[in-house]
């Protein structure tokens, strides 16, 4: 709560006057993440819903569009202060409660891997699940590498290179 208050340039007391509880603050953070995720998807004309709900949206995504979206998501999850802090918080908190583990899986592991698999299926990429796991594993690895790197631009360049290499294997 102190860190959040500091980021907002207010005291903890002022923060609690705006929100009823820590839970209320957390719910607002998750709501903001959902909103920002949707905005990212919309900006790159990517599906926001599950494939079962909007299969036609998945059919229109090209591999090149997906790669550009993936690059933007890497920047978002590493360079956007809010998203990066949320990612790091979930990484730490996933071991403290089932709810946090579920959110970690939804935002950073099973959710994205499933999304990539559905996109690859729609692109008629063979072995879509296996290739989706490999693709997303690279993204997830580079999130962690980026966090600890002194030369963050170099890590970003390495990520782009790794993604390009994977894409060549997909074609």
Language-model segments: residues:
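Amphipathic alpha-helical segments that line or abut small-molecule/effector binding pockets
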Residues: 56-79, 84, 88, 92, ...
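Hydrophobic/aromatic-rich alpha-helical bundle segments in the mid-to-C-terminal region
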Residues: 102-106, 110, 119-166
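Amphipathic alpha-helical linker/stalk segments
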Residues: 27-69
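Hydrophobic recognition helices of helix-based DNA-binding modules
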Residues: 8, 26-29, 33, 37, ...
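Helix-turn-helix
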Residues: 1-32
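Hydrophobic/aromatic residues within well-ordered alpha-helical segments
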Residues: 22, 29, 33, 37, ...
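N-terminal hydrophobic signal/anchor transmembrane helix of membrane proteins
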Residues: 45-47, 162-171
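Amphipathic alpha-helical packing segments from all-alpha helical-bundle domains
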Residues: 64, 78-124
């Amino acid at each position: 709560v102190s860190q959040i208050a500091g980021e907002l340039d207010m005291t903890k007391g002022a923060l609690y006057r705006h929100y009823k509880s820590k839970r209320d603050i957390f719910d607002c953070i998750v709501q903001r993440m959902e909103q920002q995720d949707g905005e990212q998807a919309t900006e790159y004309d990517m599906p926001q819903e599950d494939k079962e709900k909007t299969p036609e949206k998945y059919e229109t995504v090209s591999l090149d569009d997906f790669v550009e979206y993936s690059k933007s998501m890497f920047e978002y999850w590493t360079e956007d202060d809010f998203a990066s802090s949320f990612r790091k918080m979930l990484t730490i908190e996933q071991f403290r409660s089932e709810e946090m583990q579920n959110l970690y899986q939804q935002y950073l592991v099973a959710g994205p891997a499933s999304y990539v698999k559905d996109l690859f299926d729609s692109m008629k990429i063979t072995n879509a699940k296996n290739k989706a796991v490999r693709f997303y594993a690279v993204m997830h690895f580079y999130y962690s590498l980026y966090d600890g790197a002194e030369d963050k631009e170099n890590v970003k360049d390495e990520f782009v290179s790794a993604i390009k290499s994977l894409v060549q294997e997909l074609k």
